[in-house]
């Protein structure tokens, strides 16, 4: 995900602190598309599972069974991504879940590209969500995106010049998930053609 540790320090510290809290809590994370929300939510789940807690990650973009969201209150951590895409039935289910966790220790973290006030959801749900702790994820600049991709590439033992990324941002996309998936494609092609990933190589493969 497109996520800046430095810029989002307060949010990370707040979430870290929730792991030692005994009461339920609701956090609303907003930010632009491809801005690291998914990365953050999945990070919460990994950490919770690492502490032997019951945790579930749900992406509203994917088709979900009916009466699913309102059955999650026995989980310690529930992370729900893309709640700006909730159907009306799911909005009611999330509202029910919100009310149920008042009696539990569940930590509910939800994400959307808008702030609670801008969501087109049921009035009661909007009211509840505006009571959540609301954080806006800060957008990364190009250099921070490049640093983040470079860290990911080190895990894959891929050494690509920063200039190649800057070029991709300019001619291809600034969306991190799109750039990462095209790098996968370039990596496979470079292995197949035994050629390093350079700007001329990118031009050839992407026919730019």
Residue ranges and their predicted role:
Residues 159-172:
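Short conserved motifs of the RecA-like P-loop NTPase core
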Residues 1-12:
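Dynamic helix-loop-helix/coil hinge segments at AAA+ ATPase domain boundaries and subdomain interfaces
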Residues 132, 146-159:
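Conserved AAA+ ATPase "sensor/coupling" helix adjacent to the nucleotide-binding pocket
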Residues 116-130:
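Short regulatory helix/loop adjacent to the ATP-binding pocket of P-loop NTPases
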Residues 71-93, 97, 104-112:
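Conserved P-loop NTPase "ATPase switch" module shared by AAA+ and STAND
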Residues 172-186:
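The conserved phosphate-sensing helix
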Residues 132-144:
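Conserved AAA+ ATPase "SRH/arginine-finger" region at the nucleotide-binding site
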Residues 23-41:
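Walker A/P-loop nucleotide-binding motif
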């Amino acid at each position: 995900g497109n996520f800046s540790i430095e810029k989002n320090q307060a949010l990370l510290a707040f979430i870290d602190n929730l792991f030692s809290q005994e009461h339920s809590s609701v956090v609303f994370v907003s930010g632009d598309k491809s801005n690291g929300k998914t990365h953050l939510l999945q990070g919460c789940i990994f950490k919770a599972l690492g502490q032997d807690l019951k945790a579930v990650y749900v992406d509203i973009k994917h088709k979900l069974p009916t009466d699913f969201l309102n059955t999650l209150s026995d989980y310690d951590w529930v992370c729900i991504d893309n709640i700006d895409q909730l159907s009306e039935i799911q909005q009611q289910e999330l509202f029910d879940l919100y009310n149920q966790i008042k009696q539990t220790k569940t930590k509910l973290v939800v994400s959307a590209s808008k702030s609670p006030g801008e969501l087109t959801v049921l009035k009661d749900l909007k009211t509840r969500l505006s009571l959540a702790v609301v954080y806006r994820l800060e957008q990364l600049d190009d250099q921070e995106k490049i640093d983040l991709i470079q860290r990911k590439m080190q895990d894959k033992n891929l050494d690509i010049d920063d200039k190649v990324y800057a070029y991709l941002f300019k001619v291809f996309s600034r969306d991190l998930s799109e750039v990462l998936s095209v790098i996968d494609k370039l990596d496979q092609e470079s292995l197949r053609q035994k050629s390093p990933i350079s700007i001329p190589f990118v031009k050839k493969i992407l026919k730019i």
